[in-house]
Design a protein with these regions (language model features):
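C-terminal peripheral helix-coil segments that are non-catalytic and often amphipathic
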Residues: 91-94, 135, 139-147, 161-206
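Amphipathic, non-transmembrane alpha-helical scaffold segments
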Residues: 4, 54, 58, 62, ...
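N-terminal intrinsically disordered/low-complexity leader segments
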Residues: 1-6, 73, 206
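Helix-turn-helix
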Residues: 10, 14, 18-56, 60
């Protein structure tokens, strides 16, 4: 790895810290440069523009989540489809939903992508990582259909995206609200309730 690539990765790591702490709105390239102790021109040279930097941060953060989810998925391939999807849902909730800083970042990212009108090409790597995570859940679902532990719910993609968005949105709403509703115990109880609803919906009780 050359010096330029090392410097770019260093700036990227600093940018992730800033975005996780402060969100995306209101954070400028100058703010990132200051945090990394680099010139603004260097930050632009590494990433081109702010949108590209934000998307690279999002990709990097989701890659870390994806890799950890994959470890859990591959470790439990011998389990039934229902057990796999239950384990994945619980782990996803712990890894993604219970991470308040990441939930806030995702909320800020959604708003940013709409405002900046990111093109399909610009989002390609980001969307590909989310698809890889979805594919693991889909694999568990399909196995459950074969081994009889999961019932056919029709459109699994629709259910998956509704379920994951519900979990993430719950965390985001409670995080934004603050106060007593933001206690770890309260958040975890609500997440557990949603997980139980989702996994019960899958179960084949015949």
């Amino acid at each position: 790895m050359g010096a330029k690539e090392r410097n770019k990765n260093y700036v990227l790591d600093k940018a992730k810290v800033v975005f996780l702490e402060k969100g995306i709105v209101g954070v400028s390239m100058a703010d990132i440069a200051k945090e990394a102790d680099f010139g603004v021109a260097s930050v632009y040279r590494y990433f081109g523009n702010r949108k590209a930097l934000v998307l690279e941060c999002a990709v990097s953060l989701w890659k870390d989540k994806r890799d950890k989810i994959r470890v859990v998925y591959e470790k439990n391939l011998s389990q039934s489809g229902f057990e796999q999807i239950t384990i994945l849902t619980k782990y996803f909730s712990w890894l993604v939903v219970s991470d308040k800083a990441f939930s806030r970042f995702l909320l800020s990212l959604d708003s940013f992508l709409l405002t900046e009108d990111a093109t399909q090409t610009e989002r390609e790597e980001y969307d590909e990582i989310l698809l890889e995570i979805y594919t693991m859940f889909e694999g568990a679902y399909k196995k459950g259909l074969v081994d009889g532990t999961i019932r056919d719910i029709g459109s699994f993609p629709d259910f998956y995206f509704a379920a994951t968005q519900s979990l993430i949105s719950l965390s985001q709403r409670l995080t934004m609200r603050g106060g007593a509703s933001l206690t770890d115990e309260s958040l975890n109880d609500k997440i557990k309730l949603l997980i139980n609803m989702f996994t019960t919906y899958f179960a084949n009780e015949k």
